[in-house]
């Protein structure tokens, strides 16, 4: 299972969706990256493979960062706190 975390402006915790397959997770990750890079605010609707029926709609101009991680990977290689801490450190410099 792959988790895609979105950090939104003025929201202290990430919002997440999950994909079962690596290719599907990478496709969503790239879709979010392209939406962020376009600079045109639009709504992006995402769904979750783990929680059927879960839908998430975000305004692309409010996305600050996106992270994709293998949820089944050993915890020593992935640190959600580290991602957020690095983001905070970069914005404070």
Curated annotation (Swiss-Prot):
InterPro entries: UPF0367. Belongs to the UPF0367 family. NCBIfam families: PRK13683.1. This is UPF0367 protein tsr0804.
């Amino acid at each position: 299972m792959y988790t895609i975390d979105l950090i939104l402006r003025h929201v202290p915790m990430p919002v997440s969706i999950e994909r079962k397959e690596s290719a599907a997770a990478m496709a969503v990750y790239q879709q979010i990256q392209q939406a962020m890079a376009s600079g045109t605010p639009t709504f992006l609707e995402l769904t979750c493979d783990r929680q059927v029926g879960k839908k998430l709609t975000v305004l692309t101009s409010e996305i600050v960062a996106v992270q994709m991680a293998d949820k089944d990977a050993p915890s020593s290689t992935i640190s959600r706190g580290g991602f957020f801490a690095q983001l905070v450190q970069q914005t404070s410099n």
